[in-house]
Amino acid sequence: MELEMAALRERMLPSGFRFNPTPQEAVTYTLPRLIAGEPLHPAVRPYIHDTDIYACEPGVLAAQFQPTPRTGDRFFFTSCKRQPQKAGKSTRAVRAGGPGSWHSQGNSADVKDGSGVKIGEVKKLRYKKGGKFTDWLMDEFSCCSEDAVVGDRQRVLCKMYVSPRAAPDSAARQEDAAAAAAVFAPPAPEKPVAAHKRPAPSIAEQPCPQTAAT
């Protein structure tokens, strides 16, 4: 099943193309362009979904939004509400997620440029529902641009995925596989036409172009 899904995903992007931005690429290129409304590569933009990721649980998001080919990750351009804490301390984002919530796994990691200057942050989160942690994970990328903050909202780029350590029968892995199968399922074969019902062509038909093997 996994190999079939990977093969189908390979056909969704141009040969050799892969969308899996590093933290530096996410906070210096992808996210700033999304915030500014500037175009991204036409093969990439359809896989960055503009939605409130914190309004739904990850299984619902997986069913509604297709993953990125070759990696199976899902990317979302969204915003999170910032809530000020005590004076002298940083702010934290409020991250509800439908009936559950996203919980940070440790402190945010600074993203720095080649000169060591901070240019953004990446926070690791894990989804918790019914008092138990699931195998849905998320990386939340934020940049230092002033345009990223609008009122009490912080605009971020999120990468949602299933933990590589998830068991084959985990709920998250099953939700992800079911959603991917629905999105990438090949079309049903057409019913064969009976020979006596197909009229003979008056002129020779051109042969169908052969699709190059991938």
Language-model-derived ranges and their functions:
Residues 2-15, 146-214:
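Intrinsically disordered, low-complexity acidic/polar and Pro/Ser/Thr-rich regulatory regions
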Residues 31, 35-36, 143-146, 162:
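Short amphipathic alpha-helices and their capping/turn residues within compact interaction modules
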Residues 81, 129-131, 142, 161-164:
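Short, flexible loop/turn elements at secondary-structure junctions
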